[in-house]
């Protein structure tokens, strides 16, 4: 099995598979076959090269892969949900979460982090009958939470009737469902009137009293869980992140590594929306607090805006 995306994938190979003869070269053979199968409309030939030397992998990651990722993200950063005529659905994960449907917009990528609006558009163009379908956005029900009649109809159909309605910008009102592939999980932290975010790589405790794995067990499965949602890392700095509840100003805690990864863009968003400089300095992490009492004391000292916002519950 594998989880994650881009340069953060994790692949597990069972001892049984290894004992049966599975080796690194077989990854290449599988990739080769899948690329030819998935992209047969545009790919005639392909070559797979596997690097196992950590130094080579690190060099290639920084010199080739990350610049490509950054270029894609830069293109997306110029787009907004309002600037495009359609959104896209993604049901790639329905094999193990039958009722889950991702609604992918320019400002909210798929919760796995691997499917942006541009990716979903390309997927649909390559395979019009595939996992990514066009969703119109003409009939607005509630602009505040990002609810559309068109989106509800699509989700109802694609979830086989398991879901009736969904919002794009709220964690409390009709939140989008999660499968199990999410990069991050966001959960309400009532003592601080904000939310904590944990990423898949973080194995420690959160101020919510749960680890990532424990949060995942109650958030996934294609069921709406108000107060909790799975999402991609890039959604954290989005102006649409929990827009209905006040936006990124609700973020009170996340692991230090994740905070460093999103700091630049999150600080830019907070500055633009609220006029706050260096917002991430106000956000707690595991080196500061792993319990709500210590976290609230830190937030009070920093003057975190969430403490003065309307109650979420």
Regions found by a protein language model. Name each.
Residues 1-313:
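Cysteine-centered metal-binding/redox modules
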């Amino acid at each position: 099995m594998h989880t994650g995306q881009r340069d953060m994938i994790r692949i597990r190979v069972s001892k049984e598979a290894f004992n049966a003869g599975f080796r690194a070269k077989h990854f290449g053979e599988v990739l080769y076959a899948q690329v030819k199968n998935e992209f047969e409309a545009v790919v005639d030939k392909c070559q797979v090269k596997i690097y196992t030397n950590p130094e080579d992998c690190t060099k290639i990651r920084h010199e080739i892969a990350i610049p490509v990722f950054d270029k894609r993200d830069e293109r997306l950063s110029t787009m907004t949900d309002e600037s495009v005529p359609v959104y896209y659905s993604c049901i790639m994960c329905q094999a193990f979460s039958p009722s889950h449907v991702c609604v992918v917009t320019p400002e909210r990528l798929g919760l796995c982090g691997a499917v942006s609006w541009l990716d979903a558009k390309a997927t649909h163009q390559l395979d019009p009958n595939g996992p990514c379908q066009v969703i119109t956005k003409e009939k607005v029900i509630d602009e505040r939470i990002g609810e559309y009649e068109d989106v509800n109809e699509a989700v109802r159909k694609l979830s086989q009737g398991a879901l009736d309605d969904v919002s794009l910008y709220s964690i409390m009102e009709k939140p989008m469902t999660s499968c199990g592939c999410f990069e991050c999980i966001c959960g309400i932290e009532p003592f601080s009137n904000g939310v904590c975010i944990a990423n898949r790589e973080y194995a420690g405790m959160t101020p919510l009293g749960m680890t990532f794995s424990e949060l995942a067990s109650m958030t996934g499965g294609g069921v709406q869980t108000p107060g909790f949602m799975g999402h991609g890392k890039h959604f954290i700095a989005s102006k649409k992140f929990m827009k209905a509840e006040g936006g990124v100003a609700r973020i009170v805690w996340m692991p230090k590594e994740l905070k460093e990864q999103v700091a630049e863009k999150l600080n830019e968003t907070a500055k633009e929306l609220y006029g706050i400089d260096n917002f991430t300095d106000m956000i707690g992490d595991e080196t500061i607090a792993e319990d709500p009492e210590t976290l609230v004391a830190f937030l009070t000292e920093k003057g975190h805006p969430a403490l003065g916002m309307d109650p979420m519950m």
